Amino acid sequence: NIWIMSALETIESFVEGAPPGELADVIADIKALTVADPGLVSKLGPAFEKYNEEQFATVRLPGSSQPIIVSSHSSLGNGRYYDVESSSSFEYDHATQKASGAQSYVLEGAQAELTHNILGRVTNAGDRKSTLKTLSPYVKEHFPNAAYGVYPTENDSKVAIIIVANKYSPNNFWNGRWRSLYIFDPSSGALEGSLKVDVHYYEDGNVRLLTSKPISTTISSGTGAGIVKEIGNAEKKYQDELNKGFTSLSEGAFKALRRQLPVTRQKIEWDKVASYRVGQDIGGGSSRR
């Protein structure tokens, strides 16, 4: 039993560390490694659920063109989740990452109006349009492949705002994901959250970027427009910091790993490299016989 628990915990760590867009590959590898005990994979349900909720897995419902987020903030329990913008709920298979059983679901509660306002939806009858800036235009402008969601949380006392953008390019051996999570408290105007980037590059090697930045600020207006504006400021600042970090790595640490000159302390004349005689020209003199 001790060995089984140890093996299960190890396999769960594989699931937890699955790179963006590669959960199916990790599951296939786990099955290959546990052929002697195939029952272990069936015990990974909680690990799959934790992974999908933390990674903000996305899924498309039948007939829908917009991806929907799976998270603990949108959970209804028993494997069902809901989406505010499409007013629907669905069942989610965490192992296959497929949705089924879509049903109508209308959000109600103390923060329902603010939630709709952030999304830019009309909350009253008629043709009145929200005067608040919507989250949708911001996401579409800054993220080419993204999903977003706004959910009441903590007994309707706060609002959770989630943005997730995925970029998968397995043919070029890389995949990446951006995750934003904000918790807004209408009573204090506090906006707390985190920004996370996860990129995996695996051509002729295995390199992974995992970075996170906490966000803490106060919004005086407390409107949807004010919230989206502050989100935009925070994410632009983080993007600028990442760009500066990449430039610093390229011009600093990575450059320091390369020799400025060969061991001979002489630069190679690349236009004449075809005529070099190894050990003589590169060695700086006549080769010994």
Where are these regions (language model features)?
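General structural signal for secondary-structure boundaries
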Residues: 27-28, 34, 130, 203, ...
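Short, isolated positions within intrinsically disordered regulatory regions of eukaryotic proteins
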Residues: 7, 197-199, 274
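Surface-exposed short loop/turn segments
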Residues: 89-90, 129, 133, 137, ...
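Charged, amphipathic alpha-helical stretches
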Residues: 6-49
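Glycine- and small hydrophobic-rich membrane-insertion segments that are intrinsically disordered
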Residues: 106, 110, 122, 175-188, ...
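Short, Lys/Arg-enriched N-terminal segments with co-localized hydrophobic residues
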Residues: 1-4
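Long amphipathic alpha-helical scaffold segments
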Residues: 43-146
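C-terminal/domain-edge helix-coil "capping" segments
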Residues: 13-20, 43-50, 57-72, 82, ...
